[in-house]
Amino acid sequence: MRKSSRMLAAAAALALAAPASADTVCEWMELAGRLGAAAQASPTPQTADQVRATTRTALAIFEAVNSIDRRYQSYLNLPAGDSAASQDAAAATAAYQVLLHHYPAQRSQLEESYALAMAGIADARAREAGRAIGEAAAAAANQAGGVDPALPQTPYRPRTRPGEWIGASLPSLEPYWGALRPWVVQSPDALRPPPPVALTSQRWARDYEEVRRLGGRTSTERTPHQTLVARYRQAFDTMPSMRLIADAPGRTPVQNARMFAVYQMAFDDAAQAMVVAKLQYNFWRPITAIRNGDADGNDATQPDPNWVPLLPTPNFSEYPCGHCTVAAAIAEVMTAEVGNRPRGGVRIMSLAIPNSVVQAFPRWDAWAQEVSDSRIYGGVHYRFSNEAGEQIGRRAARMVLDRALQPLPRRRGSR
């Protein structure tokens, strides 16, 4: 996972980050994303607090800016603030305080970035008023979305027959996932998909055969483009699209802050439901199923004891597809924000390929579909699992869009 290089890159970015006034929301959200990626790549497992860091940052920025330019309902029930306060100061302070809370080891770099951001705000009274608003928003956000102490945190237990060997590496899914408080969804179970298809069904045989043919390392049926897609989509970065949207004429800081907050809340709620379902169903990956195709009770599946996937198999259960879940959630949120065919296209980078260029898609749904397809080309998921994940993502996003950060009625004469 290129842990060392990601951590060095994040440290360098911290040292250089000085959010510009016009891009305060994007700059701090991009910084939050880099810190989150470095924490995820670290050999030390993320804490429950850290998996909420990026969303808390987005929520704190939104609440701070929305307190000054009151356009939407407050998620954290914060009162309206001084309308003359600096929105840049409020956003920078909110982000800084949240990131410092979650990544104390980065204090010196964060302090430098924050000092540079605040130094660019000339109006001292507006700056200090914004600082106070940002501090209040961060304090509230840091308490939101955490672990519910009333819910158990059950460690994963490998399932096998007594006396039979099983791989000793535990899945990289921490016990706290099921105990986190969702942002909007009532509980992860509200989005739980139906069980995987029956192993004796025609659907199982069809999807088994698809991944066997297209997802193997030595596949002769997968095209060179499909191979590139599998590698490129292992880790994606939507920030080029977010920046393009945020920079559009007429966009306001509070609109941009809300966009990031809704995006992150939908991402989190979809991801949590997906992880809980994975642990519940414990379904086998293609590398296991295809090598044991004679053990599934289906005469239409033929075993291949030498089959290996194109991509490394993630160290946790298969169903439902995680990439498919979050990509569908993102596409649903962004379609609601700017339409399915945004001006300038859907611009995505890859975090899996060093120095990758930005790729443009015409539509959000086309990008999300390619993410889903890429997991089959990579040999790590089945089509029915992709579809289950897509459904989770869309439902989670729709719930967040319908229930959180709703526009307030505008008073007559207001702009």
Per-segment meaning from a language model:
Residues 1-8:
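Bacterial N-terminal signal peptides that target proteins for export
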Residues 23-415:
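Acidic/polar surface patches and capping/hinge elements
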Residues 11:
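Acidic, contiguous segments within the catalytic cores of piggyBac-derived transposases
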Residues 17-20:
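N-terminal signal peptide c-region/cleavage motif recognized by signal peptidases
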